Amino acid sequence: MPYRSMPKFDTGLVELGDGIYAYLQWDGGWGVSNAGFVDSDDDGLLVIDALMAPSMTQEFVRAMRTVSSLPFSKLINTHSHADHTNGNQFIEGAEIIAHQNCRNEMLDAEILAREAAVKSPPRGDKPAWIRDDWWEELAVVQPSLPAVTYGKSMSIQQGEHELTLEYRGEAHTTGDSLVLFADQNLFFSGDLCFFMPLLFAEEISRTG
């Protein structure tokens, strides 16, 4: 496969395991991230990450509703970046879970000030990486912070699946979570892995 090329795929759901789904977004560029969820008759839907623009998360919700009408029970934020947390408010009723550093980053005064400059009039110049069709949408985003945090690891029983949140240290941010499903031999990595580059240590690069 040529350098930096990737196979074409459609935006939508892919079933990875028993009741475990990934939601993929073409083309995976800046701010166009993936997410996932677990469908459990006993415990509702556990969602892994929200998305950047409200319309993106709302489309993700519509896709989940083609599988299940169960209420949302939990939402895991794998890290603090906007393309994984902006849509938190649209996963209605879910208890938000993340690493403690993720929550701290979301509360960081500098980050909140930067977000406010983007979202509040007068809004100034649009950052180059934000798509034109997102620009007005982002003004309605309200911060929705994790209510439950952990330090090293955390186990969650979701129906028949036991999943583990693990913190392996500073990487893409200071608070990245791996979401491991040992019984299915799969995991969700957030932005710990990219198609290209393999690793993008954004917050760590800023802080040295």
Task: Label the predicted regions.
Residues 2-14:
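Short acidic, Pro/Gly- and aromatic-enriched capping/linker segments at domain boundaries
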Residues 13-63, 177-191:
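Conserved beta-strand hairpin/beta-sheet module of binuclear metal-dependent hydrolase folds
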Residues 16-22, 133-139, 159-165:
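Short Pro/Gly-enriched beta-strand edge/turn motifs at strand-loop
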Residues 23-31, 108-118, 197-206:
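Acidic/histidine-rich helix-loop elements
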Residues 26-28, 138-140, 145-147, 167-170:
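Short Gly/Pro-enriched turn/cap motifs at secondary-structure boundaries
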Residues 30-32, 54-55, 80-86, 103-107, ...:
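Active-site environment of divalent metal-dependent phosphoester hydrolases
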Residues 44-46, 50-54, 155, 162-208:
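Metallo-beta-lactamase
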Residues 56-57, 62-148, 155:
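Active-site HxH/HxHxD metal-binding segment of metal-dependent hydrolases
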